[in-house]
């Protein structure tokens, strides 16, 4: 695969997306605006975090992963339409939970989690800039 010249990279290119979001202040500002929440402090954003809890299970690689004191966030860039996006989101969220909760720990220690997909295309076709879904227990 031929690499694009750096001058042609945009925010949606994996390399550029990672470099921009690696800046904790930019990442924090993006999350606060997107989720309409206040974040006091985030730990350093981790790029391409891999989670593979079992040899035979399907592992994941999170584009940008970060935490604050009681929440975890995953920000993904999606450059093409993927009909499996809803189930992929569900799987990513469950894998993040598995990664957070060690053996012997209480379920109350699970943090609130957010999985955000930034899509170049309108996945649902309603011409909206943002779609929000909540899983509740």
Please tell me what each predicted stretch does.
Residues 1-137:
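Elongated, amphipathic alpha-helical interaction scaffolds
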């Amino acid at each position: 695969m031929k690499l694009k010249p750096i001058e042609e990279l945009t925010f949606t290119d994996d390399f550029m997306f990672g470099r921009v979001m690696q800046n904790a202040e930019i990442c924090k500002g993006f999350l606060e605006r997107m989720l309409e929440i206040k974040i006091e402090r985030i730990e350093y954003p981790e790029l391409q975090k891999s989670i593979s809890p079992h040899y035979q299970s399907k592992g994941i690689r999170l584009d940008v992963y970060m935490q604050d004191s009681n929440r975890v966030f995953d920000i993904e860039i999606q450059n093409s339409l993927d009909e499996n996006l809803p189930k992929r989101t569900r799987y990513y969220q469950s894998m993040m939970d598995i990664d957070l909760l060690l053996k012997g720990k209480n379920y109350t220690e699970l943090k609130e989690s957010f999985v955000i997909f930034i899509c170049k295309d309108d996945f649902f076709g309603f011409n909206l800039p943002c779609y929000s879904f909540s899983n509740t227990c």
